[in-house]
Amino acid sequence: MKESLRLRLDQMVDRYEEVTALLSDPSVISDNNKFRELSVEHSDLMDITTLWQNYVGAEKDQADAEAMLKEASDPDMKEMMQEEIDSARDTIVEMEEALNLMMLPKDPNDKVPAFLEIRAGTGGDEAAIFSGDLFRMYQKFAQNQGWTLEILSANEGEHGGYKEIITRVSGNSVYGRLKFESGVHRVQRVPDTESQGRVHTSACTVAVMPEVEIDDTVDLNPADIRFDTFRSSGAGGQHVNTTDSAVRLTHIPTGTVVECQQERSQHKNRAQAMKMLISKIQQVKVQAQVDAADTIRRDLVGSGDRSERIRTYNFPQGRMTDHRINLTLYKLDSIMEGDLDEILDALLREHQADLMASIGGA
């Protein structure tokens, strides 16, 4: 292991011990914001500190066993010491790999809620129906994770599904788990309306954006935002509110448009829409930085161009293929029921491998 990494890990242990002591300080306990901030830091440091201490312990065990092996004359004792050395080496290799992963740069947005947008693309009615299928897939995945999913805006298709649906997903590490879902999702299947049994190809776009706090990171001039209201409508086009409580915000310089009709209160809808607008504009800034840096998310989210297909759902074959990592799974039924862990885990591993390669080449 590199000496610079050892030094950094030792510093993290020192900081962990410092934070542990601070959490017992009455002045910190009485300050809710400070206590919450330190508690999060303590939780973030705990696992890597424990693993590093175990790693150092395994190195000591190996060194002790090697010293005893040199002094041993009994064949049985030598064999036992060699087994201990081999075991310690294997443990050290495994823990070093884990430590390298844990030391990779973290996306500061990984733990925040996310806005999930699904839009029907090419394919007409079938694309809208598939948008509905994707929404239910993510909804079931969110339920399995213990997350909360709120529908902020929905434009239903004429024959089912959605032309567009925008949701907010909150819970533990939502954005970090879903961020690789952005892109074009293609479906191949026989529509219910197809009398000849021909397979049709349709597509939907998925966009996942972190919910960012409204602060100075995005400087918005109120004069650049057009504010419109309209009546929110529910399923089947029935009005669920007789007042103009739904809100549409348009950022004129960028042409960015967001809508929110979740709440009966216009004020609440406007506040939520402003968060969505901030997140969209922030995402454009982040994507520009990623494109300039070029490589880190090269195969995972691509350039952000919506013409880029990331995944195909082939219903006749029961197959899902993620084209970014050449992953094919023949369990489409369970995937559409929200079984996404195997896909998301594989995408995360590839992302981590890319990060390690970029750091190693730096």
From Swiss-Prot:
Gene source species: Psychrobacter cryohalolentis (strain ATCC BAA-1226 / DSM 17306 / VKM B-2378 / K5)
Residues with the N5-methylglutamine modification: Q238
Main location class: cytoplasm
Residues that span the membrane, as ranges: none
InterPro entries: PCRF, Pep_chain_release_fac_I, Pep_chain_release_fac_I_sf, Prokaryotic/Mito_RF, RF-1
Compartments, as annotated in UniProt: Cytoplasm
UniProt keyword annotations, A-Z: Cytoplasm, Methylation, Protein biosynthesis
Record bears the keyword Transferase: no
A GO molecular-function annotation: translation release factor activity, codon specific
GO terms for cellular component: cytoplasm
One matching Pfam family: RF-1
Function per UniProt: Peptide chain release factor 1 directs the termination of translation in response to the peptide chain termination codons UAG and UAA.
Protein name as it appears in the record: Peptide chain release factor 1
PTMs per UniProt: Methylated by PrmC. Methylation increases the termination efficiency of RF1.
Family: Belongs to the prokaryotic/mitochondrial release factor family.
